């Protein structure tokens, strides 16, 4: 598919041909859901598990006689009521790192890019700014109509001047092409790709 390319200030800068194998895939909600769930699960941390009765090193021998002492009956120092005993119904370690087939991950990213190609994709020639100031960049965004949440993806690395200028703009995030992912693409209203980013993403799937 052919898409118009513009400069960061909104002026026309020609056209670019997008690979239909990457930007023309029909999105499927079930695939996108699986990939997003996998991403969010991988971001979760897990608390250190507590030690229950079977985990503590305490004697299991009865340490006092059953009757006659005037105290309660006990038979195990690992019981939760004793200092150093195991926790009753304590937190257990949970695995938040599920596996997901690489082909499914790749397909999910293609579908996310394709969904934005239908609505919300902008291609710019580069992120070079004559004046790398937040105020100037906001003016460019307003002129181009990039409202709401905007995700900007550059090539091998992010343009430093643009990154600094965009750092104070709420709802604007910048990533290198290698950092492109389904969750971030879908949660933003507008996806801005540089021509370098398009080349990197297409090479990522076709290489």
Curated annotation (Swiss-Prot):
Q: InterPro entries, per this entry?
A: Ribosomal_uL4, Ribosomal_uL4-like, Ribosomal_uL4_dom_sf
One GO cellular component term noted in the UniProt record for this chain: ribonucleoprotein complex
Superkingdom of the organism of origin: Bacteria
Instruction: Please provide the record's keywords in A-Z order.
Output: Ribonucleoprotein, Ribosomal protein, RNA-binding, rRNA-binding
Provide the GO MF annotations for this entry.
rRNA binding; structural constituent of ribosome
Its GO biological process annotations read:
translation
Quick check: keyword Repeat in the entry? Answer: no
User: SUPFAM superfamilies attached here?
Assistant: Ribosomal protein L4 (SSF52166)
Record keyword Acyltransferase present: no
Pfam entry (one):
Ribosomal_L4
User: By its UniProt entry, which NCBIfam families does this protein fall under?
Assistant: rplD_bact
What is this protein for, i.e. what is its function? Answer: One of the primary rRNA binding proteins, this protein initially binds near the 5'-end of the 23S rRNA. It is important during the early stages of 50S assembly. It makes multiple contacts with different domains of the 23S rRNA in the assembled 50S subunit and ribosome. Forms part of the polypeptide exit tunnel.
Checking HAMAP family in the record gives: Ribosomal_uL4_B (MF_01328_B)
**Member of which family?**
Belongs to the universal ribosomal protein uL4 family.
Record-linked PANTHER family:
50S RIBOSOMAL PROTEIN L4, LARGE RIBOSOMAL SUBUNIT PROTEIN UL4M
Subunit architecture: Part of the 50S ribosomal subunit.
The entry's protein name is Large ribosomal subunit protein uL4
Q: Which organism is it from?
A: Erythrobacter litoralis (strain HTCC2594)
The organism that produces this protein has a lineage beginning with:
Bacteria, Pseudomonadati, Pseudomonadota, Alphaproteobacteria, Sphingomonadales
């Amino acid at each position: 598919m052919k898409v118009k390319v513009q400069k960061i200030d909104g002026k026309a800068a020609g056209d670019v041909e997008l690979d239909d194998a990457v930007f023309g895939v029909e999105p499927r909600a079930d695939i996108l859901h699986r990939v997003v769930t996998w991403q969010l699960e991988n971001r979760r941390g897990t608390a250190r598990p507590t030690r229950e009765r079977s985990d503590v090193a305490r004697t299991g021998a009865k340490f006092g006689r059953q009757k006659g002492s005037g105290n309660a009956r006990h038979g195990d120092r690992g019981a939760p009521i004793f200092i150093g005993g195991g926790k009753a119904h304590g937190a257990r370690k949970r695995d938040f790192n599920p596996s997901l087939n690489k082909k499914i991950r790749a397909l999910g990213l293609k579908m996310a890019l394709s969904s934005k190609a239908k609505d919300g994709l902008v291609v710019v020639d580069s992120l070079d700014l004559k004046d790398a100031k937040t105020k100037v960049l906001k003016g460019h965004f307003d002129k181009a109509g990039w409202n709401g949440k905007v995700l900007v993806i550059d090539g091998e690395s992010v343009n430093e001047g643009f990154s600094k200028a965009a750092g104070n703009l709420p709802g604007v995030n910048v990533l290198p092409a290698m950092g492109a992912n389904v969750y971030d693409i879908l949660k933003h209203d507008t996806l801005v790709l540089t021509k370098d980013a398009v080349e990197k993403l297409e090479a990522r799937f076709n290489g």
